[in-house]
C-alpha cells in the first residue's frame, strides 16, 4: 500500500469558528422557539444543540515532523502531514498500531528508565488513573534505537558480546501502519536478526584463512578492526528487511564489542602471547 497525502484538508481555525457560530446560532434558535412557542425552531435548535459537537472531533493539530494516518469505516483515506491546525471528516479514525510500543530509543525514553529491556509494551494504565491517552500520531523524526547487548558466536565459535545503535525514521506512513503488524517491534526484531547474521561472518580479531567478503579469498576482516565495514553491512541488511515497512535506516553503529566474560581472560592471555611473539619476530628481523 502506498502513502496518500491528504490534499483536501481544511483550515482548522476557520472551521472551528464556523462551528462555534453555528452552535451559538442553534442555542439562539432554541431560545427563540421556546419564547415564541415555534415548534420548528425548537426542533431545529434541539437537533443541532445535540449533535453540534460532532464536527469538533475533526479538528487536528500537527507539530513539525508529525503525521496522522486516517481511515474511514475501515478504508484508508490518507495521511495528514505538515504542521498546522486542520479539519478532516470527524468520523475518520487515526491508526497507529505501534502507539503503545516503547523501544529503548530516543523519542520513547520514559523518565530516564533507559535500563529497561529493549522492548516494553505499555499497559495503558498508570497508578492513580484508570486509563492513559494514547497519541496516534506518527513521528517522522530521525530516531535512535539502542539495541541491547547480545551474545553471539563469531565465525571461529568464540562468544562475543556486541551492541549496536540504529538511526532510523518513517518514510512511508501507509506501509508502516498497514504492511506490518507493529513497525517498531518489526524493526527491533530485524535489527537482532541482521546483527546475528553479520557477526557470524567475522572473527573477533584478525584470523588466518578466514573469508569475510564471500569472494573465496582470505582477508583481514574482523569485528574489531573493520567496525565501519561491519556496521555498514548490518545497516544494509536491516534496510533490505524493513523497506516494505516504510522505514529508512540512516546509519548503524557498533556501540559495544568485547569477548563474553567466560572467555575474556583466556583470550586476553592469548592476545598478549601473540603480541610477544610478534615483537620477538620484529627484533629478529
Task: Locate the predicted segments by residue.
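N-terminal membrane-targeting/pre-transmembrane regions
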Residues: 1-20
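Canonical alpha-helical transmembrane segments of integral membrane proteins
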Residues: 15-31
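Hydrophobic alpha-helical transmembrane segments
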Residues: 28-50
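Short Pro/Gly-enriched beta-strand edge/turn motifs at strand-loop
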Residues: 48-52, 144-147
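Aromatic-capped interface at the extracytoplasmic side
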Residues: 53-66
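Membrane-cytosol interface motif
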Residues: 67-90
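Amphipathic, interface-forming alpha-helical segments with heptad-repeat character
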Residues: 92-96, 100-256, 262
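Long, charge-rich amphipathic alpha-helical coiled-coil "stalk/tentacle" segments
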Residues: 237, 261-285
